[in-house]
Amino acid sequence: MTRLLGYVDLSEPHFVAAVLAIVFNPLFWNVVARWEHKTRKLSKAFGSPRLACYTLGGAILLLNVLRSHCFTQAMLSQPRMQSLDNPAVYHVGLALLGVGGVFVLSSFLALGFTGTFLGDYFGILKEARVTMFPFSVLDNPMYWGSTAIYLGWAIVHASPTGLLLTALVALIYMVAIVYEEPFTAEIYQQKASQAYKRS
């Protein structure tokens, strides 16, 4: 880690922007989704929970594009690491991009748009929690797939800055998981309990 930090200017504006984007995104969607769950204000404002969820999902997608742009600009504005700058390591980076892409895309296909973008906070629930691939091999595959993509992108660019930012992405996702998982479990437990009472 000390060796990585020797390559990274922590005060460089692109790096600071990337850090802010990485931290802000999950904070934004968790705060807004919890607020919606408690107040239903977004659903009321947009006329339906589904439209409100689509709108929040669109905002999250745009924020993710911004985060990826900031991440890339931060890497390009700082030095490359010579020991990472070789064909073997480059191909490892490509493999990570591919694996991460598979996890992200298959998660989206398994969950659908509303499942991916916090539909459960809007009262849009699946029949049960999704357990098919990739959820059958990994918890939170969207988050870990995204982390693998950032790691692969950093390696392809031989970027110590990218590696450091990827570590931050992973840390922020771990915090988000601790915050989100109990809530999701509680929602589906309540749904199962209500279904049991009706039967």
From Swiss-Prot:
Q: Which residues bind S-adenosyl-L-methionine?
A: G98, V99, G100, E180, E181
Reactions catalysed, as given in the entry: a 1,2-diacyl-sn-glycero-3-phospho-N-methylethanolamine + S-adenosyl-L-methionine = a 1,2-diacyl-sn-glycero-3-phospho-N,N-dimethylethanolamine + S-adenosyl-L-homocysteine + H(+); a 1,2-diacyl-sn-glycero-3-phospho-N,N-dimethylethanolamine + S-adenosyl-L-methionine = a 1,2-diacyl-sn-glycero-3-phosphocholine + S-adenosyl-L-homocysteine + H(+); a 1,2-diacyl-sn-glycero-3-phosphoethanolamine + S-adenosyl-L-methionine = a 1,2-diacyl-sn-glycero-3-phospho-N-methylethanolamine + S-adenosyl-L-homocysteine + H(+); 1,2-di-(9Z-octadecenoyl)-sn-glycero-3-phospho-N-methylethanolamine + S-adenosyl-L-methionine = 1,2-di-(9Z-octadecenoyl)-sn-glycero-3-phospho-N,N-dimethylethanolamine + S-adenosyl-L-homocysteine + H(+)
Task: Keywords in alphabetical order, please.
Answer: Endoplasmic reticulum, Lipid biosynthesis, Lipid metabolism, Membrane, Methyltransferase, Mitochondrion, Phospholipid biosynthesis, Phospholipid metabolism, S-adenosyl-L-methionine, Transferase, Transmembrane, Transmembrane helix
Q: Which residues lie on this side of the membrane: Cytoplasmic?
A: 67-93, 179-199
Identify the InterPro entries for this entry.
PEMT/MFAP, Phopholipid_MeTrfase
One BP term from GO? phosphatidylcholine biosynthetic process
Intramembrane segments lie at 13-33
Please state the Enzyme Commission number of this protein. 2.1.1.17, 2.1.1.71
> Per the record, GO CC terms?
endoplasmic reticulum membrane; mitochondrial membrane
One Pfam family, short name please?
A: PEMT
Transmembrane segment boundaries: 46-66, 94-114, 158-178
Keyword check for Membrane, yes or no: yes
Instruction: Describe activation and inhibition of this protein.
Output: The first methylation is rate-limiting.
Subcellular location(s) per record: Endoplasmic reticulum membrane; Mitochondrion membrane
Question: Main localisation, per the record?
Answer: endoplasmic reticulum
Family annotation (PROSITE patterns): SAM_PEMT_PEM2 (PS51599)
Membrane topology is:
Multi-pass membrane protein
**Superkingdom of origin organism:** Eukaryota
Which family does the entry's similarity section mention?
Belongs to the class VI-like SAM-binding methyltransferase superfamily. PEMT/PEM2 methyltransferase family.
> Which protein is depicted?
Phosphatidylethanolamine N-methyltransferase
